[in-house]
């Protein structure tokens, strides 16, 4: 029944796809809000969370059904989004083993591999692994997705529709690259925040007050990002256009190069990817 409804909803491009969220934290709330903004009915969305506060907050804010346990009504969905913490996933999935039909199960838990999730679900394979990032909380995220080979085109489209509610999506062909997704875009906002923090500190060191320094840092970063998105040129070309020979920008960039800025960024992202692989090994242990 769920599989037939999923196929029908995708083929007709309507908004009647039934979606249940296992976990009601910030990312689940962002997805629910984004889906409603995209035209999904609150009546087609449900959330399951042990926290009474979380349930009350979701019900009050979005008008969705929010329950403490995954009952039959919540399980009668086309898509099940796993939005619990990675360390809690195994225990959360135990009651689901053997109860799933053809639902597309989407995991947004960092580090967890589909083989482990599928094993905890009793050999289930209709699985999609995703890595959103925190700008999804304001609908400006980017999410990398990987689908188990058994997931058909309709299932992939269903997963894509869910995650595109909070930003852009990028499909990854090899699950091993999901650790790289985590390193580049999942952790990426922290790198940008660190840059903003440093630019603000530099502004204050030059005499601006906190409010002025923050405004310069924030709006410069935002404007540069918007320009890069809007331009057909590469970031390298845009950088070169700002850099006049013998000018202030060249002096700044030469200082950054001398400090090892480029190599430090490469090393940081590589460290994040390596840690992601380690976490996958640790989290997947029985």
Task: Tell me what each language-model feature is.
Residues 116-126, 142-180, 193-230:
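Internal alpha-helical scaffold of NAD(P)-dependent oxidoreductase catalytic cores
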Residues 45, 73, 209-216, 238, ...:
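Small-residue helix-packing motif on alpha-helices
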Residues 7, 12-16, 218-286:
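NAD(P)-dependent Rossmann-like dehydrogenase/reductase catalytic/cofactor-binding core
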Residues 6, 10-68, 72-75, 141, ...:
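NAD(P)+-binding Rossmann beta1-loop-alpha1 motif at the extreme N-terminus of oxidoreductases
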Residues 128, 177-183, 235-240:
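Short pre-catalytic strand/loop immediately N-terminal to key active-site residues, enriched for Gly-Thr
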Residues 52, 62, 70-145, 149:
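Rossmann-like NAD(P)(H) cofactor-binding subdomain of soluble oxidoreductases
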């Amino acid at each position: 029944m769920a599989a037939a409804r999923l196929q029908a909803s995708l083929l007709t491009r309507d908004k009647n796809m039934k979606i249940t969220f296992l976990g009601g934290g910030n990312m689940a709330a962002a997805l629910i809000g984004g889906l409603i903004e995209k035209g999904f009915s609150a009546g087609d969305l449900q959330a399951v969370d042990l926290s009474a506060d979380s349930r009350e907050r979701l019900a009050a804010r979005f008008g969705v059904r929010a329950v403490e346990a995954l009952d039959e009504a919540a399980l009668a969905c086309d898509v099940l989004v796993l939005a619990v913490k990675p360390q809690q996933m195994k225990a959360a999935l135990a009651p689901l083993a053997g109860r799933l039909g053809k639902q597309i199960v989407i995991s947004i838990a960092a580090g967890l591999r589909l083989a482990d999730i599928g094993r905890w679900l009793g050999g289930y394979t209709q699985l999609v692994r995703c890595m959103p990032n925190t700008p999804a909380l304001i609908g400006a995220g980017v999410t990398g997705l990987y689908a188990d080979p058994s997931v058909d085109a309709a299932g992939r489209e269903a997963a894509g529709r869910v995650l595109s509610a909070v930003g852009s999506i990028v499909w990854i062909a090899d699950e091993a690259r999901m650790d790289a997704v985590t390193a580049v875009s999942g952790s990426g906002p922290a790198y940008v925040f660190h840059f903003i923090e440093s630019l603000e500190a530099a502004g204050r060191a030059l005499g601006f007050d906190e409010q002025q320094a923050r405004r310069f840092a924030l709006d410069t970063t935002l404007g540069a990002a918007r320009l890069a998105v809007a331009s057909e040129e590469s970031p390298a070309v845009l950088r070169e256009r700002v850099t006049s020979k013998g000018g202030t920008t060249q002096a700044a960039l030469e200082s950054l190069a001398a400090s090892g800025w480029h190599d430090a960024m490469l090393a940081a992202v590589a460290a994040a990817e390596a840690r992601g692989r380690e976490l996958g090994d640790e989290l997947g242990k029985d």
